[in-house]
């Protein structure tokens, strides 16, 4: 895998060794689009264990699913921080202690080098496997295993998340450099060239509740950077489509095309549809997509507070289920300038409304006021 100028990883074919078998094209989810699906059932759910829920991004569903697999001697695969540089990689976990590494949202493209081979080897041993990831990672694993028909997937459980998109790893590293430079200037950390004194990162601290979550960086001196998601420059760049992977703007795996057994996400909008469930500590959206997913779900439901919901409610709060966002008009310019400019200033500049947008807003406000006066 080779990073391009925007920092995204892509496979590179060694033409000297290629035998033109076509396996790479057959395994690529972007080149092999499946048919859209509708879930068998939709639920709003939250773990009865309040501490577990507060430690999770939303309702704690992943941990209960993972515990079920571990209880059978199985293996759980998911995304974790590589604390050498705070990038993201997929790892395998075989005990309860390791689950904390996988718990919590990570808004980055994770490295999966060699992980599909490990999944294949675990399945060959006959042990159950829970693999969690983005829809495209689920689709890629399915395609990889389909090329090995001798391997049974009866013990494989696939869980994807509703994915907004994958930001550039390069942008994330530039953001961390900016954070460490700011900490160093305040005399409470080292500059990036001296190594990052970061001890912990959480994309989803619930210090102000689930709906107003914060991005948190804990430094070696125990000082914490804490910023609510609408105000943090990295989260703004991510959510405003300044730095996401090009394929995310035309994702081939939306509409449940990944082939996952279960899909989990935050149940955004729960306060509108089922206010009696919402306590602002986190409620998960769960889509049961297959009979295998239903079987796994039935084994964990006793530890949950569950309410039936509809697919329309799910889409209303998570439009990324069915459609891809458009890239920001300044996306390419932002990625070109990311290395040379101060990160927070550049994000503000790139997201500044253009003249046409400001003019449209002004005219709209005038027309609305005129309408009220008539």
Residue ranges and their predicted role:
Residues 12-31, 60, 136, 245-251:
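Cysteine-centered iron-sulfur cluster-binding motifs in ferredoxin-type domains/subunits
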Residues 162-174, 205-209:
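Short, conserved secondary-structure transition motifs
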Residues 72-75, 180, 196-374:
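Long, compositionally biased charged/polar accessory segments in the mid-to-C-terminal portions
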Residues 1-13, 22-39, 261-262:
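Iron-sulfur cluster-binding cysteine motifs and their immediate structural context
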Residues 89-114:
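Glycine-rich phosphate-binding "P-loop"
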Residues 98, 146-161:
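A short alpha->loop->secondary-structure connector
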Residues 23, 27-62:
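Entry/capping segment at the start of metal-dependent catalytic domains
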Residues 57-61, 83-84, 131-141, 165-167:
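Gly/Ser/Thr-rich loops at beta-strand to alpha-helix junctions
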């Amino acid at each position: 895998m080779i990073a391009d100028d925007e920092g995204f990883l892509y496979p590179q074919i060694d033409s000297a060794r290629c035998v033109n078998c076509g396996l790479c094209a057959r395994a690529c989810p972007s080149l092999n689009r499946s048919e859209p699906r509708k879930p068998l059932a939709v639920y709003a759910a939250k773990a009865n264990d309040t501490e577990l829920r507060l430690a999770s991004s939303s309702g704690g569903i992943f941990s209960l699913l993972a515990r079920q697999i571990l209880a059978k001697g199985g293996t759980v695969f998911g995304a974790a921080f590589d604390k050498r540089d705070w990038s993201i990689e997929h790892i395998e976990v075989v005990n309860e202690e390791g689950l904390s590494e996988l718990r919590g949202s990570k808004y980055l493209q994770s490295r999966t080098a060699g992980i599909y081979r490990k999944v294949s080897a675990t399945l060959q041993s006959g042990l159950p496997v829970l693999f969690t990831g983005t829809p495209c990672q689920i689709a890629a694993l399915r395609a990889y295993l389909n090329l090995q028909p001798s391997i049974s997937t009866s013990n494989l459980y696939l869980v994807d998340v509703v994915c907004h998109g994958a930001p550039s790893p390069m942008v994330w590293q530039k953001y961390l450099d900016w954070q460490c430079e700011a900490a160093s200037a305040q005399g409470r950390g080292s500059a990036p060239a001296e190594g990052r004194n970061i001890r912990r990162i959480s994309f989803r601290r619930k210090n102000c509740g689930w709906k107003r979550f914060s991005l948190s960086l804990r430094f070696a001196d125990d000082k914490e950077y804490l910023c609510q998601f609408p105000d943090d420059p990295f989260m703004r760049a991510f959510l405003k489509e300044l730095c996401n992977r090009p394929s995310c703007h035309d994702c081939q795996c939306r509409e449940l095309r990944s082939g996952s057994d279960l899909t989990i996400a935050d149940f955004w909008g729960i306060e509108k549809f089922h206010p009696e469930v919402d306590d602002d500590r986190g409620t998960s959206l769960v889509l049961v997509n297959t009979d295998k997913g239903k079987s796994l779900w039935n084994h964990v439901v006793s530890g949950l507070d569950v309410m039936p919901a509809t697919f329309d409610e799910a889409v209303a709060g998570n439009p990324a289920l069915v459609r891809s966002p458009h890239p920001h008009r300044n996306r390419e310019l932002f990625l070109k300038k990311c290395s040379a400019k101060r990160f927070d200033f550049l994000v503000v500049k790139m997201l500044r409304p253009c003249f046409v947008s400001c003019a449209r807003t002004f005219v709209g406000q005038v027309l609305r006021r005129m309408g009220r006066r008539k």
